[in-house]
Amino acid sequence: MLIQHARLVDAEGEREGDIFIRDGHIAAVGAGLAAAGGEPVLDAAGLVAMPAFIDLHTHFRTPGFEHKETVETGSRAAARGGYTFVNCMPNTSPVCSTGAIAQSVMDEARRVGLCDVNQCVSITKDFDGRTVSHLRALPKNLRFISEDGKGVRESKVM
């Protein structure tokens, strides 16, 4: 697919240009690109193309508060806004203090398939402000911890 005449915005600045996509990946970016025979062409004049966004503080509310937001509705909103990675806070019910809870959210996000989702785990077990032993049992793919608005009040806990 060839996207032509888009306003390209990136770290280098703004310019009009084209984007050639092959096999679902950007193969070329530049001005005056030509479509291969039979490739669809999209005229993006008046539209903006830019790198995806990352949101490090989201609330998908799973588990326990799905009446506010689910992994699917949150993923849809993120993707629609141009976000390809979101990081969900652990203030859920139960509090996301285990690898199993975090993994279930991330598995659901993979099933939905709209953006990459990381589920934070609480710094202290169930936001109790003291217990951190649960962190030793976390799998390596859990990359972020947060007390999300609670704060850790004791320096020796940190």
Place the predicted regions along the sequence by residue.
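Poly-acidic low-complexity segments
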Residues: 41-46, 70, 133-137
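Histidine/acidic-residue-rich, glycine-tolerant segments that coordinate divalent metal ions
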Residues: 92-103, 108-158
